Amino acid sequence: MTADSFREASGALTRRQLVIGGGAAALAGVPVLANAQSKTIKIGYLTTLSGVRANFGEADPWSLERVRAALKDGLTIGGTNYKVEIVVRDTQSDANRGATMSSELLLREKVDLLLVQDSDAALAAGQLCDVNGVPMVSTMGPWQAITFGRGSTPQKGFPFSFHFFWGADDVLKNFFGMWEPLKVERTLGTLYIDNGPGHAFADPANGIPNGAKQRGYKETNGGFFKIATDDFSNQVSSFKAARANIVSGFAYANHFATFWKQAQQAGYRPEAVTMAAAFLFPSAVESLGAAGNGMSTEIWWTPSFPFKSSLTGQSAKALAADWESSTGKQWTQPIGYGHALFEVGIAALKNASNPKDKKAVRDALANLQLDSIVGRIDFKGSPIKSVAVTPMVAGQWRKTKAGAKFPYELVITHNSTATQIPVEDELKLLSQLKSA
Protein backbone atom coordinates (compact mmCIF):
# COMPACT_ATOMS: atom_id res chain seq x y z
CA MET A 1 0.00 0.00 0.00
CA THR A 2 1.34 3.39 -0.92
CA ALA A 3 1.84 6.10 1.67
CA ASP A 4 0.40 8.75 -0.65
CA SER A 5 -2.95 6.97 -1.06
CA PHE A 6 -3.37 6.66 2.70
CA ARG A 7 -2.39 10.27 3.41
CA GLU A 8 -4.90 11.51 0.85
CA ALA A 9 -7.68 9.26 2.15
CA SER A 10 -7.10 9.93 5.83
CA GLY A 11 -6.71 13.71 5.67
CA ALA A 12 -3.64 13.49 7.93
CA LEU A 13 -2.58 16.74 9.59
CA THR A 14 -0.11 18.89 7.72
CA ARG A 15 0.65 21.34 10.56
CA ARG A 16 1.98 20.39 13.94
CA GLN A 17 0.37 21.63 17.12
CA LEU A 18 2.91 22.49 19.79
CA VAL A 19 2.61 22.75 23.54
CA ILE A 20 2.35 26.34 24.74
CA GLY A 21 4.32 26.66 27.93
CA GLY A 22 2.50 27.73 31.08
CA GLY A 23 3.27 30.97 32.94
CA ALA A 24 4.57 31.51 36.43
CA ALA A 25 1.20 30.55 37.89
CA ALA A 26 1.75 27.01 36.72
CA LEU A 27 4.85 26.80 38.87
CA ALA A 28 3.26 28.12 42.04
CA GLY A 29 1.19 25.11 43.06
CA VAL A 30 0.66 24.10 46.66
CA PRO A 31 3.25 21.42 47.61
CA VAL A 32 0.66 19.04 49.07
CA LEU A 33 -1.46 19.23 45.89
CA ALA A 34 1.60 18.73 43.70
CA ASN A 35 2.55 15.65 45.71
CA ALA A 36 -0.98 14.23 45.37
CA GLN A 37 -0.92 14.81 41.63
CA SER A 38 2.47 13.16 41.32
CA LYS A 39 0.96 9.97 42.79
CA THR A 40 -2.00 9.92 40.43
CA ILE A 41 -1.69 8.41 36.96
CA LYS A 42 -4.08 10.05 34.53
CA ILE A 43 -5.15 8.00 31.50
CA GLY A 44 -7.03 9.63 28.64
CA TYR A 45 -9.52 7.48 26.73
CA LEU A 46 -10.76 8.61 23.32
CA THR A 47 -13.73 6.68 21.96
CA THR A 48 -16.87 6.78 19.80
CA LEU A 49 -19.89 6.98 22.09
CA SER A 50 -22.08 8.70 19.50
CA GLY A 51 -22.28 9.29 15.76
CA VAL A 52 -22.08 6.86 12.84
CA ARG A 53 -19.57 4.58 14.59
CA ALA A 54 -21.26 4.61 18.01
CA ASN A 55 -21.71 0.83 17.88
CA PHE A 56 -17.92 0.49 18.17
CA GLY A 57 -18.06 2.27 21.54
CA GLU A 58 -21.36 0.85 22.78
CA ALA A 59 -19.71 -1.43 25.34
CA ASP A 60 -17.22 1.17 26.60
CA PRO A 61 -19.22 2.46 29.61
CA TRP A 62 -19.66 -1.15 30.73
CA SER A 63 -16.00 -1.99 30.10
CA LEU A 64 -14.78 1.15 31.86
CA GLU A 65 -16.82 0.23 34.93
CA ARG A 66 -14.97 -3.08 35.13
CA VAL A 67 -11.55 -1.59 34.42
CA ARG A 68 -12.07 1.01 37.15
CA ALA A 69 -13.11 -1.77 39.54
CA ALA A 70 -9.91 -3.66 38.72
CA LEU A 71 -7.90 -0.50 39.44
CA LYS A 72 -9.81 0.63 42.55
CA ASP A 73 -6.79 0.05 44.79
CA GLY A 74 -4.47 1.81 42.36
CA LEU A 75 -1.24 0.48 40.91
CA THR A 76 1.81 -0.27 43.03
CA ILE A 77 4.89 0.32 40.90
CA GLY A 78 8.43 0.42 42.24
CA GLY A 79 7.15 0.44 45.82
CA THR A 80 4.86 3.44 45.25
CA ASN A 81 1.08 3.22 45.06
CA TYR A 82 -0.51 5.38 42.38
CA LYS A 83 -4.18 6.19 42.05
CA VAL A 84 -5.46 5.79 38.49
CA GLU A 85 -7.83 8.35 36.96
CA ILE A 86 -9.44 7.65 33.59
CA VAL A 87 -10.66 10.69 31.63
CA VAL A 88 -13.05 9.83 28.78
CA ARG A 89 -13.81 11.91 25.69
CA ASP A 90 -16.29 11.16 22.89
CA THR A 91 -15.14 11.88 19.33
CA GLN A 92 -18.78 11.70 18.15
CA SER A 93 -17.37 9.68 15.21
CA ASP A 94 -15.93 12.89 13.77
CA ALA A 95 -12.21 13.15 12.94
CA ASN A 96 -12.09 16.92 13.53
CA ARG A 97 -13.70 16.61 16.94
CA GLY A 98 -11.33 13.74 17.63
CA ALA A 99 -8.39 16.08 17.05
CA THR A 100 -9.94 18.68 19.37
CA MET A 101 -10.57 16.12 22.12
CA SER A 102 -7.03 14.78 21.75
CA SER A 103 -5.65 18.27 22.25
CA GLU A 104 -7.88 18.76 25.29
CA LEU A 105 -6.72 15.52 26.90
CA LEU A 106 -3.06 16.32 26.28
CA LEU A 107 -2.91 20.04 27.00
CA ARG A 108 -5.73 20.70 29.47
CA GLU A 109 -6.07 17.36 31.25
CA LYS A 110 -2.33 16.63 30.94
CA VAL A 111 -2.79 12.88 30.73
CA ASP A 112 0.19 10.61 31.30
CA LEU A 113 -1.01 8.12 28.68
CA LEU A 114 -3.58 8.33 25.89
CA LEU A 115 -5.60 5.29 24.77
CA VAL A 116 -7.51 5.69 21.50
CA GLN A 117 -10.30 3.31 20.52
CA ASP A 118 -11.35 5.37 17.46
CA SER A 119 -8.88 4.60 14.66
CA ASP A 120 -9.99 7.64 12.64
CA ALA A 121 -9.12 9.89 15.59
CA ALA A 122 -5.81 8.06 16.03
CA LEU A 123 -4.32 9.87 13.03
CA ALA A 124 -4.47 13.34 14.57
CA ALA A 125 -4.07 12.07 18.13
CA GLY A 126 -0.89 10.21 17.22
CA GLN A 127 0.66 13.26 15.64
CA LEU A 128 -0.21 15.42 18.66
CA CYS A 129 1.22 12.83 21.04
CA ASP A 130 4.44 12.54 19.06
CA VAL A 131 4.90 16.32 19.02
CA ASN A 132 4.12 16.71 22.71
CA GLY A 133 5.98 13.62 23.91
CA VAL A 134 2.97 11.79 25.36
CA PRO A 135 2.76 7.98 24.94
CA MET A 136 -0.29 6.79 23.02
CA VAL A 137 -1.79 3.43 22.09
CA SER A 138 -4.55 3.03 19.48
CA THR A 139 -6.46 0.10 18.00
CA MET A 140 -9.46 -0.99 15.89
CA GLY A 141 -8.16 -0.05 12.44
CA PRO A 142 -5.85 -1.79 9.92
CA TRP A 143 -2.27 -0.90 10.81
CA GLN A 144 -1.59 0.26 7.25
CA ALA A 145 -4.14 3.07 7.63
CA ILE A 146 -2.18 4.36 10.64
CA THR A 147 1.40 3.82 9.47
CA PHE A 148 0.93 5.00 5.89
CA GLY A 149 -1.90 7.40 6.72
CA ARG A 150 0.53 9.41 8.84
CA GLY A 151 3.28 9.29 6.26
CA SER A 152 5.50 6.75 7.98
CA THR A 153 6.89 3.35 6.98
CA PRO A 154 7.16 -0.05 8.71
CA GLN A 155 10.86 0.64 9.21
CA LYS A 156 10.43 4.14 10.67
CA GLY A 157 7.39 3.98 12.96
CA PHE A 158 6.63 6.82 15.38
CA PRO A 159 8.40 8.29 18.43
CA PHE A 160 5.56 8.09 21.01
CA SER A 161 2.50 6.52 19.36
CA PHE A 162 1.76 2.80 19.02
CA HIS A 163 -0.98 0.75 17.38
CA PHE A 164 -2.13 -2.85 17.67
CA PHE A 165 -4.51 -4.57 15.27
CA TRP A 166 -4.42 -6.80 12.22
CA GLY A 167 -3.52 -5.63 8.74
CA ALA A 168 -5.58 -5.35 5.58
CA ASP A 169 -3.32 -8.04 4.10
CA ASP A 170 -4.46 -10.48 6.81
CA VAL A 171 -8.10 -9.81 5.97
CA LEU A 172 -7.50 -10.47 2.30
CA LYS A 173 -5.76 -13.78 3.02
CA ASN A 174 -8.79 -14.86 5.03
CA PHE A 175 -11.36 -13.57 2.54
CA PHE A 176 -9.78 -15.25 -0.48
CA GLY A 177 -8.97 -18.37 1.53
CA MET A 178 -12.58 -18.60 2.67
CA TRP A 179 -13.85 -18.29 -0.91
CA GLU A 180 -11.37 -20.82 -2.34
CA PRO A 181 -13.56 -23.95 -1.87
CA LEU A 182 -16.71 -22.30 -3.29
CA LYS A 183 -17.91 -23.99 -6.46
CA VAL A 184 -18.88 -20.82 -8.34
CA GLU A 185 -17.40 -18.85 -11.22
CA ARG A 186 -14.75 -16.42 -9.92
CA THR A 187 -16.56 -13.15 -10.55
CA LEU A 188 -16.28 -10.44 -7.90
CA GLY A 189 -18.03 -7.10 -7.37
CA THR A 190 -16.38 -4.57 -5.03
CA LEU A 191 -17.22 -1.20 -3.48
CA TYR A 192 -15.49 0.91 -0.83
CA ILE A 193 -16.09 3.85 1.51
CA ASP A 194 -13.90 6.83 0.59
CA ASN A 195 -11.86 6.83 3.82
CA GLY A 196 -8.55 5.47 5.12
CA PRO A 197 -9.59 1.84 5.67
CA GLY A 198 -11.57 1.89 2.41
CA HIS A 199 -8.46 2.91 0.50
CA ALA A 200 -6.52 0.19 2.30
CA PHE A 201 -8.83 -2.49 0.94
CA ALA A 202 -8.99 -0.90 -2.53
CA ASP A 203 -5.24 -0.34 -2.91
CA PRO A 204 -4.29 -1.55 -6.43
CA ALA A 205 -0.95 -3.00 -5.31
CA ASN A 206 -1.85 -4.73 -2.05
CA GLY A 207 -5.63 -4.61 -1.67
CA ILE A 208 -8.53 -6.64 -3.03
CA PRO A 209 -7.85 -5.75 -6.71
CA ASN A 210 -4.38 -7.30 -6.67
CA GLY A 211 -5.54 -10.32 -4.67
CA ALA A 212 -8.35 -10.91 -7.15
CA LYS A 213 -6.01 -10.64 -10.13
CA GLN A 214 -3.49 -13.05 -8.64
CA ARG A 215 -6.17 -15.65 -7.94
CA GLY A 216 -7.95 -15.48 -11.27
CA TYR A 217 -11.02 -13.49 -10.25
CA LYS A 218 -12.72 -11.15 -12.70
CA GLU A 219 -13.38 -8.01 -10.65
CA THR A 220 -16.04 -5.41 -11.33
CA ASN A 221 -14.93 -2.41 -9.27
CA GLY A 222 -17.83 -0.26 -8.10
CA GLY A 223 -15.38 2.38 -6.88
CA PHE A 224 -15.45 4.64 -3.82
CA PHE A 225 -18.55 6.18 -2.27
CA LYS A 226 -18.91 9.02 0.24
CA ILE A 227 -19.98 8.20 3.78
CA ALA A 228 -23.33 9.99 3.29
CA THR A 229 -24.20 7.99 0.14
CA ASP A 230 -27.61 6.30 0.04
CA ASP A 231 -27.82 5.36 -3.65
CA PHE A 232 -25.96 2.26 -4.85
CA SER A 233 -27.97 1.67 -8.02
CA ASN A 234 -24.90 2.09 -10.25
CA GLN A 235 -22.95 -0.57 -8.34
CA VAL A 236 -25.93 -2.92 -8.28
CA SER A 237 -26.44 -2.52 -12.02
CA SER A 238 -22.78 -3.14 -12.87
CA PHE A 239 -22.50 -6.17 -10.55
CA LYS A 240 -25.67 -7.71 -11.94
CA ALA A 241 -24.52 -7.16 -15.52
CA ALA A 242 -21.17 -8.80 -14.73
CA ARG A 243 -22.91 -11.68 -12.92
CA ALA A 244 -20.67 -11.13 -9.90
CA ASN A 245 -21.06 -14.19 -7.68
CA ILE A 246 -19.24 -12.61 -4.74
CA VAL A 247 -19.60 -9.09 -3.32
CA SER A 248 -16.85 -7.63 -1.16
CA GLY A 249 -15.13 -4.39 -0.18
CA PHE A 250 -15.40 -2.05 2.80
CA ALA A 251 -18.70 -0.55 4.00
CA TYR A 252 -20.48 0.18 7.26
CA ALA A 253 -23.70 -1.58 8.20
CA ASN A 254 -26.02 1.26 7.16
CA HIS A 255 -24.38 1.43 3.71
CA PHE A 256 -24.69 -2.29 3.13
CA ALA A 257 -28.32 -2.40 4.27
CA THR A 258 -29.16 0.21 1.63
CA PHE A 259 -27.06 -1.54 -1.03
CA TRP A 260 -28.63 -4.92 -0.26
CA LYS A 261 -32.18 -3.60 -0.37
CA GLN A 262 -31.52 -2.04 -3.76
CA ALA A 263 -29.82 -5.25 -4.96
CA GLN A 264 -32.82 -7.37 -3.96
CA GLN A 265 -35.21 -4.95 -5.65
CA ALA A 266 -33.14 -5.23 -8.84
CA GLY A 267 -33.12 -9.04 -8.67
CA TYR A 268 -29.38 -9.26 -8.04
CA ARG A 269 -28.56 -12.25 -5.82
CA PRO A 270 -24.87 -13.13 -5.41
CA GLU A 271 -23.76 -16.43 -3.85
CA ALA A 272 -21.46 -14.91 -1.22
CA VAL A 273 -21.21 -11.53 0.49
CA THR A 274 -18.07 -10.80 2.51
CA MET A 275 -18.02 -7.10 3.34
CA ALA A 276 -15.35 -5.77 5.69
CA ALA A 277 -16.79 -3.72 8.62
CA ALA A 278 -20.45 -4.20 7.62
CA PHE A 279 -21.14 -7.38 9.61
CA LEU A 280 -19.05 -6.91 12.72
CA PHE A 281 -22.16 -6.52 14.87
CA PRO A 282 -25.13 -8.86 15.31
CA SER A 283 -27.46 -5.86 15.07
CA ALA A 284 -26.26 -5.24 11.50
CA VAL A 285 -27.16 -8.79 10.49
CA GLU A 286 -30.46 -8.73 12.38
CA SER A 287 -31.46 -5.51 10.59
CA LEU A 288 -31.45 -7.48 7.32
CA GLY A 289 -34.01 -9.94 8.67
CA ALA A 290 -33.87 -13.37 7.05
CA ALA A 291 -31.52 -11.94 4.40
CA GLY A 292 -28.80 -11.67 7.05
CA ASN A 293 -28.33 -15.44 7.10
CA GLY A 294 -24.96 -16.28 5.54
CA MET A 295 -23.31 -12.87 5.51
CA SER A 296 -19.56 -13.30 6.07
CA THR A 297 -16.99 -11.07 7.70
CA GLU A 298 -13.56 -10.63 9.18
CA ILE A 299 -13.37 -11.68 12.83
CA TRP A 300 -11.16 -9.82 15.30
CA TRP A 301 -12.54 -11.43 18.44
CA THR A 302 -15.21 -13.90 19.58
CA PRO A 303 -15.90 -15.86 22.78
CA SER A 304 -14.31 -18.81 20.94
CA PHE A 305 -10.85 -17.20 20.94
CA PRO A 306 -8.55 -19.23 23.26
CA PHE A 307 -7.17 -16.20 25.12
CA LYS A 308 -7.59 -14.57 28.54
CA SER A 309 -7.22 -11.11 30.06
CA SER A 310 -3.98 -10.10 31.75
CA LEU A 311 -5.98 -7.54 33.73
CA THR A 312 -8.87 -9.60 35.16
CA GLY A 313 -7.90 -13.19 34.31
CA GLN A 314 -11.19 -13.71 32.44
CA SER A 315 -11.27 -15.90 29.35
CA ALA A 316 -12.78 -14.53 26.14
CA LYS A 317 -15.82 -16.71 26.80
CA ALA A 318 -16.18 -15.39 30.36
CA LEU A 319 -15.85 -11.75 29.29
CA ALA A 320 -18.54 -12.18 26.63
CA ALA A 321 -20.81 -14.01 29.09
CA ASP A 322 -20.32 -11.20 31.62
CA TRP A 323 -21.49 -8.66 29.03
CA GLU A 324 -24.51 -10.73 28.00
CA SER A 325 -25.65 -11.44 31.57
CA SER A 326 -25.19 -7.78 32.55
CA THR A 327 -26.89 -6.20 29.55
CA GLY A 328 -29.08 -8.86 27.96
CA LYS A 329 -27.38 -8.02 24.65
CA GLN A 330 -25.28 -10.26 22.45
CA TRP A 331 -21.49 -9.85 22.63
CA THR A 332 -19.74 -7.68 20.03
CA GLN A 333 -16.20 -7.77 18.70
CA PRO A 334 -15.05 -4.36 20.06
CA ILE A 335 -15.59 -5.64 23.62
CA GLY A 336 -12.36 -7.63 23.33
CA TYR A 337 -10.30 -4.82 21.87
CA GLY A 338 -11.62 -2.13 24.20
CA HIS A 339 -10.57 -4.36 27.09
CA ALA A 340 -7.20 -5.16 25.51
CA LEU A 341 -6.46 -1.45 25.08
CA PHE A 342 -6.43 -1.08 28.86
CA GLU A 343 -4.45 -4.30 29.23
CA VAL A 344 -1.72 -2.77 27.07
CA GLY A 345 -1.81 0.59 28.84
CA ILE A 346 -1.69 -0.87 32.34
CA ALA A 347 1.08 -3.33 31.41
CA ALA A 348 3.20 -0.49 30.01
CA LEU A 349 2.72 1.60 33.15
CA LYS A 350 3.67 -1.37 35.34
CA ASN A 351 6.75 -2.12 33.24
CA ALA A 352 7.98 1.48 33.13
CA SER A 353 10.83 2.46 35.44
CA ASN A 354 8.68 5.47 36.40
CA PRO A 355 5.01 5.59 35.29
CA LYS A 356 5.04 9.41 35.53
CA ASP A 357 8.00 9.61 33.15
CA LYS A 358 6.52 9.72 29.65
CA LYS A 359 9.71 8.53 27.98
CA ALA A 360 9.90 5.58 30.36
CA VAL A 361 6.31 4.61 29.51
CA ARG A 362 7.11 5.01 25.81
CA ASP A 363 10.09 2.69 26.21
CA ALA A 364 7.94 0.17 28.08
CA LEU A 365 5.47 0.16 25.20
CA ALA A 366 8.22 -0.32 22.62
CA ASN A 367 9.41 -3.40 24.54
CA LEU A 368 5.97 -4.80 25.40
CA GLN A 369 5.19 -8.48 24.82
CA LEU A 370 1.78 -9.28 26.32
CA ASP A 371 -0.67 -12.19 26.19
CA SER A 372 -4.07 -10.50 26.19
CA ILE A 373 -7.78 -11.19 25.71
CA VAL A 374 -7.28 -10.69 21.93
CA GLY A 375 -4.09 -12.75 21.72
CA ARG A 376 -0.37 -11.95 21.69
CA ILE A 377 0.48 -8.23 21.50
CA ASP A 378 4.17 -7.94 20.66
CA PHE A 379 5.68 -4.53 19.93
CA LYS A 380 9.23 -5.62 20.74
CA GLY A 381 9.42 -8.46 18.24
CA SER A 382 7.29 -6.89 15.52
CA PRO A 383 8.87 -6.30 12.09
CA ILE A 384 6.64 -3.22 11.82
CA LYS A 385 7.93 -0.48 14.10
CA SER A 386 5.34 0.95 16.54
CA VAL A 387 2.84 -1.75 15.49
CA ALA A 388 1.82 -5.09 16.99
CA VAL A 389 -0.12 -7.29 14.57
CA THR A 390 -2.86 -9.28 16.31
CA PRO A 391 -4.53 -12.52 15.18
CA MET A 392 -7.71 -12.48 13.11
CA VAL A 393 -9.82 -15.01 11.23
CA ALA A 394 -12.99 -14.98 9.11
CA GLY A 395 -16.47 -16.35 9.54
CA GLN A 396 -20.14 -16.43 8.64
CA TRP A 397 -23.30 -15.38 10.44
CA ARG A 398 -25.78 -18.24 10.73
CA LYS A 399 -29.40 -18.19 11.84
CA THR A 400 -29.80 -20.01 15.15
CA LYS A 401 -32.40 -22.64 15.99
CA ALA A 402 -35.80 -21.68 17.34
CA GLY A 403 -35.65 -20.83 21.04
CA ALA A 404 -32.00 -19.74 20.96
CA LYS A 405 -30.99 -16.73 23.04
CA PHE A 406 -30.08 -14.66 19.97
CA PRO A 407 -31.24 -14.91 16.32
CA TYR A 408 -27.75 -15.21 14.79
CA GLU A 409 -24.39 -16.67 15.77
CA LEU A 410 -20.96 -16.02 14.24
CA VAL A 411 -19.20 -19.20 13.06
CA ILE A 412 -15.44 -19.25 12.33
CA THR A 413 -14.91 -20.60 8.80
CA HIS A 414 -11.27 -19.77 7.98
CA ASN A 415 -8.09 -19.33 10.03
CA SER A 416 -5.07 -19.32 7.70
CA THR A 417 -3.47 -16.35 9.50
CA ALA A 418 -4.19 -17.62 13.04
CA THR A 419 -4.24 -21.42 13.17
CA GLN A 420 -4.32 -21.36 16.99
CA ILE A 421 -7.98 -20.29 16.64
CA PRO A 422 -10.12 -23.33 15.67
CA VAL A 423 -12.33 -23.41 12.55
CA GLU A 424 -15.95 -24.28 13.37
CA ASP A 425 -17.41 -24.91 9.89
CA GLU A 426 -16.86 -24.18 6.19
CA LEU A 427 -18.34 -21.19 4.36
CA LYS A 428 -21.71 -21.98 2.80
CA LEU A 429 -23.29 -20.37 -0.28
CA LEU A 430 -26.23 -18.04 0.35
CA SER A 431 -28.37 -20.27 -1.88
CA GLN A 432 -27.47 -23.30 0.27
CA LEU A 433 -28.57 -21.57 3.46
CA LYS A 434 -31.74 -20.24 1.88
CA SER A 435 -32.80 -23.72 0.77
CA ALA A 436 -31.77 -25.44 4.01
Question: Where are the model-predicted features located?
Answer:
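Extracytoplasmic "Venus flytrap"
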Residues: G44-V67, R89-A95, D118, L191-A202, ...
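Solvent-exposed, acidic/polar segments of extracytosolic/periplasmic ligand-binding ectodomains
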Residues: N293, A366-A436
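Extracytoplasmic ligand/sensor domains, especially the bilobed periplasmic-binding protein
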Residues: V111-G223, A272-T297
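Extracellular/periplasmic periplasmic-binding protein-like sensory domains
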Residues: A263-H339, N351-A352, P407-E409, T413-S435
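Beta-alpha junction/loop-to-helix N-cap segments that form part of ligand/metal-binding clefts
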Residues: N55-W62, G74-G151, F225-F232, A253, ...
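C-terminal segment of N-terminal export signals and the immediately downstream linker at the start
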Residues: G11, V32-L49
